[in-house]
Amino acid sequence: IYIKDKMVCDIVKSGFVDLGVVGSDRIHEGNFENRIVKIKTLSKISWPLVIAIPLDSSIKSMSDIKTIATQFPKSVNSYLDSVDLREKIRIIKIQGSAEAMPYGKWLGKRIDAIADISITGKSLRNNSLIRLGKPIAVFHPVIIANKKSIKLKNKMAYYRQFIKK
């Protein structure tokens, strides 16, 4: 069945389907790491999570940023923890087009930067944004399974013949 990527983990976890393919970002952001089983990472495909700032911004490094708008707060916080900046940068969780956020205020707060998926950079360029440094995370498609289904040997043996290809 074809469904929105936001729903794949929930539907697999519920047992409605045995297997699904979803981005590792959805697994991480939705806290599904312990609620589904990762069968295989399809590592030939990837998409980077980047920090982007307006072209005319005075920001030179991550330590200059006060606020970041993103659909990926857990991933951004993981990165900020790794560079010891989590306490200094406020994360604002948004849904939808992050690219417009640095050009206005969100609930009265100025947004310094965004964290968003950028494969080609075209959307960033179209919105006069530039990447700040290297990607902070890289995501991949993952084949996932329902925890109960994985225990059924006949069923998983059947699926494995397709997964190996």
Question: PLM ranges: what are they?
Answer:
Residues I1-K165:
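Domain-level signature for soluble enzymes in the chorismate/prephenate branch of the shikimate pathway
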